[in-house]
């Protein structure tokens, strides 16, 4: 289903982002985790978010309005981006400043590649979000690239690692940008939160 999704603008500082009262959902993950592809699949709008086979394509805070009811924030990835260390530090600071200070931020969706065991950089992001009291959920991407058995194996590994420090695990979604699997569940979750906020 094609949604009414429109690009607002890109920003290199959260303070330059427009003041918006609508609930905002941020998407973040390692470089090349499939973030832009998932956003396009989620909204049904091809090339809404620019995709690239090269890690580090997204370098700014990109805001989109969805159905004129909520805001989607596409944030720079972390990890393998082919950029100088100073640039990566700058991006990291920009993202963390946004996440800590964006007043209408409702939830962060942290994307992880379903083909990989828990990685240090992902776990560090989870720890940082939790320590700063920022609500988040996990989205496992690219489940179409492997068997269901392998996906379940990776999911079990994540559950085991997170259970070592968490009594209640974050909500998890299994998705595929190719088939669209999981996008309906994700949109339903966002819609439920929006209704709770409205009430």
Curated annotation (Swiss-Prot):
Highest taxon, organism lineage: Bacteria
Biological processes, Gene Ontology terms: division septum assembly
Cofactor: Mg(2+)
InterPro entries in the record: G_ENGB_dom, GTP-bd, GTP-bd_ribosome_bio_YsxC, P-loop_NTPase
Pfam families (UniProt xref): MMR_HSR1
Binding site for Mg(2+): 36, 58
Keyword Iron: no
EngB-type G domain mapped to chain residues: 21-196
Binding site for GTP: 29-36, 56-60, 74-77, 141-144, 175-177
GO molecular function: GTP binding; metal ion binding
Similarity remark: Belongs to the TRAFAC class TrmE-Era-EngA-EngB-Septin-like GTPase superfamily. EngB GTPase family.
Task of the protein: Necessary for normal cell division and for the maintenance of normal septation.
The protein, known as: Probable GTP-binding protein EngB
Gene field: engB
